[in-house]
Amino acid sequence: MSFPRGSQTQKIKHPIGTRKGPLEVPPPTEKDWPKDDEQDHVLVDPDEELDSLPQPYRMINKLVNLLFDQSWEIIEERNALREAESSQIQPTVYPPLGEIQLNKMPNCMAVSQDYVFIGGAKGFSIYNLYSAKQIYAWEKLKVDVTSIWATDLGNEILIAPVDEMGIIRLFYFYKEGLYLVKAINEVDDTSKQTTCIKMEISQGGDFAAFLLQGAGDIWLDVYKLPKETWLKKLEHPQLTSNPKKKVRQPQLNSLGPISADPLEMDANVSFKGDIKLSLPVYIMKIKPPKPVTGTTFKSPLEVFAKIKDCYGLGSGQNHFIKDSQWEQQAEIFNASYKKYLDREWEEEPLSTATFYFLLPSCLFAMPPEVKGPSGMACVLGIHWTRSHNFFLYSLNRTLKDKADPEGVWPCAAPIAVSQLSCSSSYLVLACEDGVLTLWDLAKGFPLGVAALPQGCFCQSIHFLKYFSVHKGQNMYPEGQVKSQMKCVVLCTDASLHLVEASGTQGPTISVLVERPVKHLDKTICAVAPVPALPGMVLIFSKNGSVCLMDVAKREIICAFAPPGAFPLEVPWKPVFAVSPDHPCFLLRGDYSHETASTDDAGIQYSVFYFNFEACPLLENISKNCTIPQRDLDNMAFPQALPLEKRCERFLQKSYRKLEKNPEKEEEHWARLQRYSLSLQRENFKK
């Protein structure tokens, strides 16, 4: 085959480092080689020689080079990370102050007053928070406690453990006695057994609500707790006890203490199985809202008659939209989004609920004929999965009354997450579109609406006790703070945000921790505020680290870690409890399998006790964390000070600014001297 002369010339490839001019055979020794200038050489792309390799070697060569380049980038990235970490100041890591040793794996824990409640394989145990001694153990064969709640009622504590069968029991812990109130959802027929998913007890312990699931249905049972009757019966047992009644001896499967841990027991605490307390009063059952269907009303007048007294207004149930209109809208929707609807969709899980007990306020006023003690809940607020509405149910009802909502707060998007503050004064509703609605329930108006950054969606909300920054230190104001709130929001992308709102000013959102892009092991898994330390939160990361962050300064103060033999085996789901009254928290340490023995019965599990006051960096913060309100008022409203104080403060601030610039300081003092001389001359003339 012949080619044109021109095309044959174009296909000539120069070797690397070829010379201009005629080719010469170099001498056999380097001494005789001519010393040419760099201009006499033609630099050719080295890749041209690689491209000349035949297949499949050319592709293999490119893949090897690509793999080498990627490996080199990873090596450089790791080296840069090591250099950055070595240059940064690592936070001080504090070990635990105490340890609770267990023979069983602790599944859950709760802290209330001076007690720790730990749920395990055969029930739950009660420990002293400071001495780490077991004071009582309630255990039942073949029952694993998977979750536990403890509510402080002042002198009493309500304990609610849930076992692996989903049965929730309500216990009353008073002085030296533990009393079983009721097994809320226990039935004789196991085929009809329901499962408790969630529970909530009102502030003060007057009401309790239990979210139950069974037979493909889900609902909320609400009870009124006769705590005054319980207290009266236990304080005056001689008035209610029957001396002729025989006490039944506990059997093998009855409720009773079966100690399994070789720890010191407190003989004063015991289970009072012979004393029967009054049962909770069942007041209502709440089911998820029905799907919106075509109207059954024949005229708009029937609709208005249905919603008299404004009950249920805004829920979308009582409307005048016909089935044909719904079908027409469904056809339009299916035609517009057909390519998305043709996919295989997973079956939607059962709807669940989030609910709170709300105190009387401007929004929830109790009827005049109803007289209740101050601080007693009057309304139950609830929202269901994929629902736009936040429903309000009055607690002033009986079982005969129909469980219709007294109020509805509709939102623009389905409510994904919500949270009520510990004081029940503030409520945050986070929708699926990333919009937060902040409510001041005590005053009865919204604090504002804030939107998370684009791509961020709320995962959990954690309220902080309101604090102020005074002289560079976080302080709690003395007295009650009104219409001011702060909370941290953990998003689904593991970013952490601080949300602040004050009065009529719009809420602000600031980023505390950015979304991890390269180092996924630093992903935040859980966040817990520390009430004993103003503006502090515990951050649990995927790599097992536990850090304490100051949200005002946006920096890590210190870190906490269990001993090396007890790492966090499941760091993305840590088991911990923060005390609401004391400067401490508890963390479960998972036993290391590397050091485990062949005998599983000899394995010891531990719950570690960390005290913030034992840390040198934190010991002064928890002891001096309050500031008088007058100091904050002086800082916030300097115009309220006398004229002399205001002038003195102004001169002090000006002097601090001048210290940074010596030239301006000399000029300023010279001007003051001239002014003072002129004032003296005027006085002499007078």
Curated annotation (Swiss-Prot):
Spell out the Basic and acidic residues composition-biased ranges: 29-40
Keywords attached to this entry: WD repeat
The residue spans of each WD repeat are 410-449
Q: Which domain of life is it from?
A: Eukaryota
Q: Which GO terms describe its biological process?
A: electron transport chain
Gene that produces this protein: WDR93
Xref: PANTHER family: NADH-UBIQUINONE OXIDOREDUCTASE (PTHR12219), WD REPEAT-CONTAINING PROTEIN 93 (PTHR12219:SF17)
InterPro entries per the UniProt record, alphabetical: NADH_UbQ_FeS_4_mit-like, WD40/YVTN_repeat-like_dom_sf, WD40_repeat_dom_sf, WDR93_beta_propeller
- Any keyword Oxidoreductase? no
Protein name, please? WD repeat-containing protein 93
| GO CC, one annotated term | respiratory chain complex I
Region (Disordered), start-end ranges: 1-40
Give start-end positions of Polar residues composition bias. 1-10
